[in-house]
């Protein structure tokens, strides 16, 4: 059997599975977890978002440590758009960082208890909390949104970002959707001084393309090398990987010229 994710009308990815080991449904979300010979387990959320258990650290480390190794004082972090608690676990490696995890669907979240290796450790961490809505009076130094948002959906999040904050969000695959992402980046770029796409190196997922945006900080020039190199127990992230994630092929950089602010 195979589980399939389609990233465009001309491109799809298939993963070999053995059997379904969990099927959970709530009012707004569905979760299926399959046994996988290559990745131990594969979680399929809402028939479109795939999480590969053995590769969770690859994306989670990048999403958390890219902004947190650039902002000098990231006291408050908001994570939204996913059930992936591993991003929060990685963010909590940074001392004194408080993490708010925006998620209303408690049923689906707790159905992933055996899928995420650090589920209990994260959920009961003193600097972590699950919230159902954003406090309009609170601002965050870092906001990480792990799903693709429309320009209309993304605008309200800017109100919760501190003036020197860093915003991370997912992009569609830049190779498959170059023109639509160029327009999308143009729509976001006028809010920020820096707006640069980055890619998870060696990722098997076609949707591992993201945006780093800030009014103040540059993801390469302001990288805190000592902080990045002092992190312990990581599988993927390090300072050189961080810098290389922002390097685009020349033809792609040329195609996106004018929409990237670096």
UniProtKB/Swiss-Prot annotation:
<keyword id="KW-0745">Spermidine biosynthesis</keyword>
<dbReference type="InterPro" id="IPR035246">
    <property type="entry name" value="Spermidine_synt_N"/>
</dbReference>
<comment type="function">
    <text>Catalyzes the irreversible transfer of a propylamine group from the amino donor S-adenosylmethioninamine (decarboxy-AdoMet) to putrescine (1,4-diaminobutane) to yield spermidine.</text>
</comment>
<comment type="pathway">
    <text>Amine and polyamine biosynthesis; spermidine biosynthesis; spermidine from putrescine: step 1/1.</text>
</comment>
<dbReference type="GO" id="GO:0005829">
    <property type="term" value="C:cytosol"/>
</dbReference>
<keyword id="KW-0808">Transferase</keyword>
<feature type="binding site">
    <location>
        <position position="84"/>
    </location>
    <ligand>
        <name>spermidine</name>
    </ligand>
</feature>
<dbReference type="InterPro" id="IPR037163">
    <property type="entry name" value="Spermidine_synt_N_sf"/>
</dbReference>
<comment type="subunit">
    <text>Homodimer or homotetramer.</text>
</comment>
<dbReference type="Pfam" id="PF01564">
    <property type="entry name" value="Spermine_synth"/>
</dbReference>
<keyword id="KW-0963">Cytoplasm</keyword>
<dbReference type="GO" id="GO:0004766">
    <property type="term" value="F:spermidine synthase activity"/>
</dbReference>
<protein>
    <recommendedName>
        <fullName>Polyamine aminopropyltransferase</fullName>
        <ecNumber>2.5.1.16</ecNumber>
    </recommendedName>
</protein>
<feature type="binding site">
    <location>
        <position position="29"/>
    </location>
    <ligand>
        <name>S-methyl-5'-thioadenosine</name>
    </ligand>
</feature>
<dbReference type="InterPro" id="IPR030374">
    <property type="entry name" value="PABS"/>
</dbReference>
<comment type="similarity">
    <text>Belongs to the spermidine/spermine synthase family.</text>
</comment>
<dbReference type="InterPro" id="IPR001045">
    <property type="entry name" value="Spermi_synthase"/>
</dbReference>
<dbReference type="InterPro" id="IPR029063">
    <property type="entry name" value="SAM-dependent_MTases_sf"/>
</dbReference>
<feature type="domain" description="PABS">
    <location>
        <begin position="1"/>
        <end position="262"/>
    </location>
</feature>
<dbReference type="Pfam" id="PF17284">
    <property type="entry name" value="Spermine_synt_N"/>
</dbReference>
<keyword id="KW-0620">Polyamine biosynthesis</keyword>
<dbReference type="GO" id="GO:0008295">
    <property type="term" value="P:spermidine biosynthetic process"/>
</dbReference>
């Amino acid at each position: 059997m195979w589980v399939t994710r389609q990233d465009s009308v001309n491109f799809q990815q298939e993963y070999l599975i053995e059997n379904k080991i969990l099927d959970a449904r709530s009012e707004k979300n569905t979760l299926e977890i399959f046994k996988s010979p290559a990745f131990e387990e594969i979680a399929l959320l809402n028939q479109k978002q795939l999480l590969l258990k053995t590769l969770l650290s690859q994306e989670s480390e990048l999403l958390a440590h890219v902004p947190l190794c650039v902002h000098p004082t990231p006291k408050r972090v908001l994570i939204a758009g996913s059930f992936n608690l591993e991003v929060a676990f990685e963010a909590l490696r940074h001392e004194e960082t408080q993490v708010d995890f925006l998620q209303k669907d408690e049923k689906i979240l707790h159905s992933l208890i055996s899928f995420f290796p650090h589920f209990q450790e994260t959920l009961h961490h003193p600097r972590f909390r699950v919230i159902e809505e954003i406090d309009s009076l609170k601002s965050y130094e870092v906001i990480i949104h792990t799903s693709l948002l429309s320009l209309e959906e993304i605008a309200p999040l800017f109100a919760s970002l501190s003036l020197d904050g860093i915003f991370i969000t997912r992009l569609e695959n830049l190779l498959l959707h170059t023109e639509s992402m160029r327009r999308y980046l143009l729509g976001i770029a006028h809010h920020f001084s820096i707006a640069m796409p980055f890619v998870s190196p060696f990722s098997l997922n076609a949707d591992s393309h993201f945006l780093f945006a800030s009014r103040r900080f540059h993801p390469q020039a302001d990288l805190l090398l000592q902080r990045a190199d002092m992190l312990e127990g990581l599988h993927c992230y390090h300072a050189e990987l961080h810098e290389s994630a922002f390097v685009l092929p020349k033809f792609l950089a040329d195609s996106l010229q004018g929409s990237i602010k670096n």
